[in-house]
C-alpha cells in the first residue's frame, strides 16, 4: 500500500501539537489595522488552536508525526 502524502499547503499553514491538536495563524492580520481596536490587534498575535470539529479533517491532510 502506498504511503499517504502530506498536503503541502496544510503543512505550511498548520502545526500539530503534542496532544494531537492543531495550531494556526489568525486571519485578519495583514492590513487595515486602523479599523481594529488595540484589544483585537493584541489578541490576533501569535497562533490559535483549531476547533475540535475540524481536527479529523486536518489529521488526514497531515498524516505523519
UniProtKB/Swiss-Prot annotation:
Enumerate the SUPFAM superfamilies for this protein: L35p-like
Tell me the PROSITE patterns matching this sequence. Answer: RIBOSOMAL_L35 (PS00936)
Domain of life, per lineage: Bacteria
Indicate, by first and last residue, each region the UniProt record lists as having compositional bias (Basic residues).
Answer: 1-18, 31-44, 55-65
GO BP, one annotated term: translation
Which lineage do the record's taxonomy fields give for this organism?
Bacteria, Bacillati, Bacillota, Bacilli, Lactobacillales
* Family statement drawn from the similarity comment of this UniProt entry: Belongs to the bacterial ribosomal protein bL35 family.
Please identify the protein, giving its name as recorded: Large ribosomal subunit protein bL35
Region: Disordered; residue ranges are 1-65
